[in-house]
């Protein structure tokens, strides 16, 4: 991801997080697709530090990376999650929500 894309991503997550908190909407975030970026850039690092990572499921990985590594894709020609890929990710996500009491703000 180029620097503009990285900044947009972090800014969007930050803005959405703040909106949910302001409106007292319980939320959990995760990456559907890989989002590797260099947070050594000061502007990125400053905003990244403001993210509430307690509400971010596996922030260093993505659903896509999980299904690829676990071979839970639809087919060799379609890397979308299989039914089992969705189910396993969902179970982990539910466990994360319950373990961290994230159903409320």
Each model region followed by its residue ranges:
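Alpha-helical cap/lid subdomain in secreted, periplasmic
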Residues: 1-105
